[in-house]
Each structure stands twice: as structure tokens, then as C-alpha cells.
């Protein structure tokens, strides 16, 4: 069955809507079944998102494209929770060089108490950098052994043991600093590139998402689904518009994907091979024009794809580049603000990081003076037992949702985090309280152990969220 299925619950929805999805890393597991539920009554015309919301947005766009294809469409999205439950952590695969650092991060996530967290971090650090720990331990250990052998007394033995302990700490700390300053920087400031690593037999999250997009779209052509495909679905069905945010760190500005055709960016093949699946790279290198750098830089460069040839997986990955956890996406362009022609001709490397740094909730994406379809939005919020009775709520009156909650913080770490969040989210927060916006935002509240950076959520927690 490849044509419209009148008997399917997704066959012919009478209503049309737009949807915008907020970012939130693993909090995005709440989206698939919410989209499935909406898809029973609505056809999605315009779909937008940021970060994890961008992942859900491309999945929704692919499902809308494949709505009438057997085992594809929203039937495919309905199976996502069962896949994520046992596999979420395994999808985040650090590079081999950064695996010890990632294991320290995971150990900290799994610990339930402050004391347990300290013990877990220490054990993971020593286990991950055991050679550096051993080399640091050796001098003091030798002093202690020699003192014991010659009967040097407890003072010399104690000195040797203290020296060994100090050496162990110094060795591990030195290796941690080296990993952060060298390995992490070399991985474009992210532990996980997104694709399967040599030590693993499982897909990384980019591999999984690329496959999900094709399966939801019913795409069996072997090439990735593109924004151009969404603009011209088969059988004369209406076009699907998809948009997402990304952030150019070197330019200190956001971009909406797909970019306009005059963007002037190029990508270098070997760099992108580290973050995109082979079949995606095969498509890009055959569809995108080669670029010859005027200054003769080494490498194999291609023009960034125009909207018609931009794969959905590339847009999603550029939006989902959570700093330090997921590596940034490199592009290159010339800087025409420079005075010297020789300098203007040189390619400058630009890192694209998480779209949530610029706008984590781009509810403005599809605004029009005279909208002809409603825009729904899903916001992922923090749970507060004094404020939230329901896990999901909508403004119930004209004044509901017009004010922002007062949210205290603790300590220096909380202060620094709140500074960052205030600078990053103030515009989204204010916009979400405006009349005409707040009435169409569904708020999903999550507890501290749910969503966010909690990569170690068990299957039961994930199923509860969805």
C-alpha cells in the first residue's frame, strides 16, 4: 500500500497546522508521540525546531512526506520510544581519544549523591587515564619502597606515600587538562561527533537519525531526503516547509536553515566525513560543486548545498551541536571585511554550534500578518511541585502564561549558569508571554532527573516521559 490509506488514522486529516519544537537534548524524547497524536487530526504544513527540537522537526517532516506510505510516516515515529529506551546512551559515542573524558561525565550523571559523585568521578578518571596515574604514582612509590627496604623509618615511608598520592593526582589532572585543551579542541569542542566510532557496533545518533528520516519518509532511493524533496512531495501533495536554527560562533550570529543561496560557505570533505554517514557524504560530494580556494588551501572543498539539495540530516546536525557534548560543524568562507586582497582570499574556518544558543524556542518562524493555519508550539519546562499539578498544561485563560516564574538558584555554579541562561533565553522567554503566542504553547514539565543532559535515563523513565 503506497497510496493514500483511507482506513489509516493518519490517512486524510481535515485540519492543517504549523508546529514549533523547543530544544532540550534528551528532553526531545517527549516529542515523537506528541507529534503522532497531533498527526491524527492535523496535516503539518510548516515545521520548525531547535537542537533536539530540530531532530524531532526533521522526523516530523519526513513522516509528513511519507504519511501515506505503509510502515512509514507517523507509524514509524510511533516506534521511536521503544528504540530509544534501551539504546539512548549508546548513541552518544565519543571519539576514542575522548572516551575517558566521556566516561567521567557519565559516571557523574549516574551518581546519586555528592559523595558518590566525587568517588565516581575519581574512579573514572583514574581508570580512564591509568597510565598517567601510574607514571605519576611511580616516583613516590619508589621512595616508599626504598625507605621500607633500607629501614628508613615511618617518616620516609609516609613521605613516599604522600609523594605517590600527589603524583597520581598530578598525573591524572595533567592528562585531563591535555584532553580538554588538545583532544576536545581537535574534536571541535565536542566529545561526540555523532557517527559510529571504531570501537562500537551500534549507530551513533546521526546515523540513527539519518536512517529514521529515510524510513519515516518511505525513501528507498539510497540518497538522503532533502529540503527540495519536501518542497515537491509526490502525487501532487502540498509542500512541507521545514526550518531550524544554528549558531555561527565565529560570526556571533544565528542562521536559519536552509540558508539562502548567497551564503558563500564551503565545507571540507575530510572534516565532514568525521560527522556525517558515508552515504550522506557520497550524495553531497556528487551534488555539490567543487570549490577551488583562491589562496590554495589544502583540502577538498565543496560549496554548501543550496536548499533544494540540502539533506535534512545536515540541517538537524548543524542545529544539534550542544557545546562540549556534541562537536560543532565546521564550514569555511572568505572574510571580505579585511583590507588586504591576499587576506580576503584566504578561507576562514567557521564553527556552527547549537541553535539553542541563539533561539531555543523559535516560535516566530512562521509568523504572518494574516495567518491561515494555527501554529502550535511545545515548550519543555522545569518541574516545580509548588507550581505544577499536571505534567502538561496549556494556558486556560487570557491572563494565564502572561508572567514568568521566579526561579531561585544556589551557589556560584547556579549564578554562572543563570547568567548564561538569561543572556541566551531572554528573547524567547519574553516572546512566549505575549498575547497571540502564549495561548498556543503547550508546556511539558520535566523533573531534574528527566531529559536535559541525562543520557543515562533508564527505559522506564523514557517511557514515562513519552
Where does each model-flagged region fall?
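Patatin-like phospholipase
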Residues: 1-466
